């Protein structure tokens, strides 16, 4: 190896690693912050000014299909039932979510979106669709596949964290 023959192998590798580490760290931190800021500006419009990005993520987790149990929603968001209950209570008061106890087992509580909640869900869905379209519009099929695989690995890493 060229660098090893000049006694620079380990030093060079360490420097390359640090450059990559610093670049990736900077990009990831900036990217997460940018996504949160952009999402907040894009999602909280005049129509939905009474909810936060966190509320919007709860709305997304409730979904537009059949009612979901509070337990299922809390697991999908990775939050405690207490935390979810506080968020759902606020969304019920604002008219985005309804709550109903199970008919067979009254201990089970189901949440579903109102028409207002469905409109917020669609707004959020369109934001994500537009974001993905803009990110991928200038990529080749191969570049899009590499980007997708990279994000899947990143997601897998985050899911393995305690």
Q: What do the PLM-derived regions correspond to, one by one?
A:
Residues 89-146:
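Charged, amphipathic alpha-helical coiled-coil/dimerization segments
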Residues 2, 52, 107:
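Exposed loop/turn and edge beta-strand positions of beta-sandwich/beta-sheet ligand-binding modules
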Residues 13-49:
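N-terminal leader segment of winged-helix/HTH proteins
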Residues 1-15:
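Single conserved hydrophobic/aromatic residue that forms the stacking wall/gate
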Residues 60-64, 125, 152:
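Short, locally clustered residues in the helix-turn-helix/winged-helix DNA-binding domain
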Residues 38-82:
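N-terminal helix-turn-helix DNA-binding core of bacterial DNA-binding proteins
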Residues 20-24, 31, 126-162:
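Terminal interaction helix/tail motif
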